[in-house]
Curated annotation (Swiss-Prot):
The gene is ydiL. The chain crosses the membrane at residues 7-27, 44-64, 80-100, 127-147, 159-179, 202-222. The keyword Hydrolase applies. This is Putative membrane peptidase YdiL. One of its GO terms (molecular function) is endopeptidase activity. One of its GO terms (cellular component) is plasma membrane. It is found in: Cell membrane. Its main location: membrane. It is an enzyme of class 3 (hydrolase).
Amino acid sequence: MRKQYWFIILTYIIMQFSALIAIPLLFKFGYAGGQPTDENMLHAQGLWSVISFIACLVVVLLILRTVPKETLRNGQKDSIGLSILWAIAGFFIALFSQGIAGSIEYYVFGIGRESENTQAILDVIQAVPLMIIVSSIVGPILEEIIFRKIIFGALYEKTNFFFAGLISSVIFGIVHADLKHLLLYTAMGFTFAFLYARTKRIWVPIFAHLMMNTFVVIMQLEPVRNYLEQQSTQMQLIIGGLFL
């Protein structure tokens, strides 16, 4: 693995743990009047997430500029047009694989569909709306660079698709700190790895991941959920009226 990739991984790790030091310092220097209440902590977490993720992405992109351009296994990239089709299809494939994995977790292992990681992110978004930039744009870009381009790519050069996909996807799931849904994250990781291996273009899984995260966040926002529930109720009344 190139030394630049190790620097990128180290940058990502530092970013992930930086809140342990940064948030207490924010309060020490007077943020929110120095009062670490639950509400203020949520705001601080959101604020620092936005700052740290964007800073991390800038550093990662600058480091990537020093890496010689090469394709996965030196293979031929798919055409731009075909790659766009795969990026769009990848969004639906990711949703499908997520649904299958979620159903297996629920019906086979008795694991609830609620995700603590997703709910925690939604709570922060409610407190700091700018956080949606992290969950829907910056986060997916960083994760695809780390877990697909670097980890999957390095393993795929030495092994096969299944082994590289499995290891990188399991690590992807563990990092999300929601181990009961490890199967779900692994399924999504395999989907994004397939898109990268198929097209040889990292922006393809980035786009699919970005669209999926955006879709999930939008569908979980309270105004949207209320609207969908209202439409569902009206549809049931209409269907019920047809049989009266």
